[in-house]
């Protein structure tokens, strides 16, 4: 085996990176907020998982053909966008995916890692000791830096971490699925069936729609392995299969977890297991689950940061971020890459940390206001996934048009019927979901502006984010997503004094390194 090949990810390591980057944070952290958003109505709760699963699965099948497109100096989503839409599309996705999507979520997952770590120690020790949110920010920053350094030093080692964590994280999920479904009427921890509809939890379609961003967050990152295309052995052959197999597994597990959770009206895996098993076994089972949840969270953060590091490397390599071209004249590519990893994380630290600590938030019980909560962080984590599912839809539609107009330009294809069914279903549902979400958000602000948006995970500290607060976060992220690539392009022309799109000419980019 060549040294270059030995440093790359094999099929199972890459599959583990994919599954590891998807399974974990979403199902462990978002299930409770999805339950809250749907008002604990079992049908809306379960259907939200099913709709999100259908969208994600068919999108993944569509991308299993799209990922056959030839490799360039770009990786994954940016490469596919370039091949289909040209240099401007390739640049836009490269910058947005690296700086906006991965940069922000990498930092947010650090905070979630802190929360699950403290919850683990509280569970293991049997004491609910105080841990302020500012401390979660500090510990979260440590985790983010650790995962970035690990992946910067060796993506191969990161692949082994993903492989181990992926196997282990399924243990509590499998236990929860079988226990919850096989014992639907057993309630040892105050559970009940969320399918028993009362006046307090009537089915509301708009709330199902409002839950979709959290669901799509749980399913998202299924294309992260594409961002590691140049790190996967026999990538052109294996990446499509990895995406399809991985998503079938994930959608199956998530749907069963959604059903199991609704049968017991428990939004957390630990709560679900505690409701099924006898009270005298709850502590031991909860500690058992906490260990695997901890490993799972670290695995997700590790896998996402692997994609983040690789994407920033691409930005620097192509001088696609302001100042990179000038800095590379004085410093090595490695030093410049480290600089932009730091700059990206610092920017998002300011955007995330300051509002989370400084903004006044109303208390859930209506007794006043408070500071320091993860509700803003949780809300911010939902919208990148929703926005990028819109990007996925645009790529699928553009590729489908190319497939019709220039059929001979498509060298490798999956079954035609399978592709078209998947492309039509996924793109249609994504469009409907995005449009319905925007409408539901506006409606929620118009009718219940100061009601809870349902955001918050382990450290909400009794505070809530209102519907209008959630809407403002969504609008802010849309503005950043749309405007920053243009601002970056303009600054490059002034600071580095060259036309960035020259670097995306076919002669310079279409030869893989």
Which role does the model predict for each range below?
Residues 1-46, 50, 56-64, 485-513:
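Membrane-interface "cap" regions at the ends of multi-pass membrane proteins
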Residues 3-7, 39, 124-125, 129-135, ...:
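Helix-loop-helix junctions that connect adjacent transmembrane segments
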Residues 8-18, 86-100, 140, 201-212, ...:
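Select transmembrane alpha-helical segments in multipass membrane proteins
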Residues 35-43, 121-133, 156-165, 273-277, ...:
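Transmembrane helix-loop boundary segments of multi-pass membrane transporters
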Residues 58-69, 73-140, 148, 294-311, ...:
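Hydrophobic transmembrane alpha-helices that form the core helical bundles
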Residues 78-86, 244-302, 320-380:
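TM-loop-TM module centered on a large, flexible mid-protein loop between adjacent transmembrane helices
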Residues 143-168, 226-231, 399-410:
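Membrane-water interface regions at transmembrane-helix termini and the short interhelical loops
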Residues 329-334, 389-442, 464-469:
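C-terminal membrane-solvent junction of multi-pass transporters and transport-like membrane proteins
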